Amino acid sequence: MKNTFSRLFGFGDKESEFELQDESHEEIDKKVYEEIQEIPIVNITPNRYQPRTVFDDARIEELALTIRTHGLIQPIVVRQYEDEKYEIIAGERRFRAATKLGWEKVPAIIKNLNDTETASVALIENLQREELTAIEEAVAYQKLIELHNLTQEALAQRLGKGQSTIANKLRLLKLPEEIKNALLEKSITERHARALIPLKNEELQLKVLQEIVEKQLNVKQTEERIAKLLEEAKPKRKAKQKAVSRDTRIAMNTIRQSLQMVADSGLNVNSEEEEFDEYYQITIQIPKKK
């Protein structure tokens, strides 16, 4: 049987970037010790690559009650990094619930994975659960891109998602920390946060964030507020304007569409349009690095 994470990220494969041939039982045995072991909780540490930064105490309590009643049906998965020291690969919520129950030991399966494999498994395992906040999801995408030296398009293909989905999530990472924290705490939604992106001024972004929270603005109200601010920020046009030729309009629209395509690819492009008596001026800033 093909390993899900290996198939996606090509661990140990030389022929194809992301396809892993069926392993023999001997090869699997070298990689995974399938027997369940009872490991002291004090010897286990959380995964350093865990994308989830907020754990719902109430949900952990519910899980603990379920485990108390029915037992831990699915062991956690760990890897050994020192003598009698283990790092969680998958199952941190179960680990936290067992800790809350006061268990001294927890059932675990030990896998031999390197740092890159451990990080990838932890990130993808959480992404597949679809319980991450938008910021946690964005962090997971960014880490996978860095770990495997992928483009946004390549990552999207491997995860079966649209490239625009990946790009939109990653844009959230460029927002101020206060806005990212509001997303983590679920004070605002992802659509609220994305609406704030066109406001390039951080002070203005934080001001609108405060309005959203204090006035409990919905997404439509937020977008209308931001549209008004953007309109107010535009340079005042002169009363008399010369007629714009059809060719000029086509040229301007083509440039705008091209800039939007570049932005959709994940590159943070800043542009500014100015209108003068005899010409339009478009200033474009393209970062050297993503």
UniProtKB/Swiss-Prot annotation:
Protein name per Swiss-Prot or TrEMBL: Nucleoid occlusion protein
Keyword Cell division: yes
SUPFAM superfamilies registered for this protein in UniProt: ParB/Sulfiredoxin
Family: Belongs to the ParB family.
Gene that encodes the chain: noc
GO MF annotation terms: DNA binding
Subcellular location: Cytoplasm, Nucleoid
GO cellular component: chromosome; cytoplasm; nucleoid
The UniProt record lists the keyword Cell cycle: yes
Record-linked InterPro entries: Chromosome_partition/occlusion, HTH_ParB/Spo0J, Nucleoid_occlusion_protein, ParB/RepB/Spo0J, ParB/Sulfiredoxin_dom, ParB/Sulfiredoxin_sf
Keywords: Cell cycle, Cell division, Cytoplasm, DNA-binding, Septation
SMART domains per the UniProt record, alphabetical: ParB (SM00470)
Biological process according to GO: chromosome segregation; division septum assembly; positive regulation of sporulation resulting in formation of a cellular spore
Function: Effects nucleoid occlusion by binding relatively nonspecifically to DNA and preventing the assembly of the division machinery in the vicinity of the nucleoid, especially under conditions that disturb the cell cycle. It helps to coordinate cell division and chromosome segregation by preventing the formation of the Z ring through the nucleoid, which would cause chromosome breakage.
Main location: cytoplasm
DNA-binding region in chain numbering: 153-172
Species assigned in the record: Bacillus cereus (strain AH187)
